[in-house]
Amino acid sequence: MKPAPWSLNLSFARACLAALRCGRVVLLAVVPLFVQAQGEAQPLPVLTLSVLQFGTPHWELDHLKRHGLDKANGFDLKVRLVADLPASRLALSSGSVDGAVSDLLWAQARYEAGTLYRYLPFSSQIGEVLVNDSSPIRTLADLRGKRIGVAGGPDGLGWQLLQQAAAGQGIDLAREATVQYAAPPLLSQALRRGQVDALLTFWHFSARLRGEGGVRIAFGLADLIGTLGLDPDLPVLGYLFPQAWAIEHDDLLQRFSRALRETKDQLASQRDLWQEIRPLMRADNDAVFAALHDSFVEGIPQPLDAARIAALHRLLLLTGAEPEKLMPAALFQSEP
């Protein structure tokens, strides 16, 4: 026997009334599901960077990722670890990663060769000239006739700046000193053994040697930049991104820039956070750890503006770039 039509209408009315009475509950249940579905439909953009496993950029990227500063700024950071700098540059040039860290001179050389990279500052640390504690070397003039170990090769930024500063005092180091190029660890041993009188090396190798004791800074390259009439806080190391990619992913690059500034601010102001990074620093003792920490923080650069970009251009000119072939200001990433 079929139910009467009026009974069906009554059942429908009762259902509607019940729905209205619990509408608040229904909405509260449905809205989170809708938001969740929306979030699942729009995954965060991914930024992939190539860094050396024990390289100094890995320190800050580890902190950025560990504390969720990528997700907080609307992207997902993926770090690809490589064994050495050539491997990192190969990953960048082949397009297997979005970005990598290199120095200003390399970015300029790539530009002159027709490959454009966007340059986001990483550090203003270059290196230092170290001598043994008992060494009489204290000035550029004292390097005449001495054996100088140079990390980074003849085209490295540090060696270029050291020669420019010496030339300003009438000293031709390439002719008036004995120069030995080698890998930083080998040169560190050479200084300890007295096989070189002075060592020009990268800042983190310098910090490690000083932390171990027995050596001192004869002069820092940042100080030499000052003698050349330039701001010593210039970011000579940076994150590089292919320009075509940077234009297409401008919003993602801005998000990374914000997260990076937050990272640097936290690492500069909260020393206890460095205990999480210490395994990557390979700091065998507290003195080495302190020296590495202090040097990293000292190298955190100020944001780029027109004046600082112009100073970077002057630095490139000093190191041999031609005026008509300078990286344009548009390739230097300013902070949002």
Residue map of PLM features:
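Conserved C-terminal helix/tail region of periplasmic/extracytoplasmic solute-binding proteins
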Residues: 313-336
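N-terminal secretory signal peptides that target proteins for export/translocation
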Residues: 1-18
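Short, solvent-exposed loop/beta-turn-alpha elements that line the ligand-binding surface or hinge
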Residues: 72, 222-232, 297-306
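Pocket-lining segment of extracytoplasmic ligand-binding domains
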Residues: 104-105, 185-277
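Secondary-structure end/capping motifs
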Residues: 246-321
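Short, glycine-/small- and polar/acidic-enriched structural segments
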Residues: 42-172, 180-181, 197-203, 218
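Boundary at the C-terminal end of the N-terminal hydrophobic targeting segment
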Residues: 37-41
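Bacterial N-terminal signal peptides
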Residues: 22-33
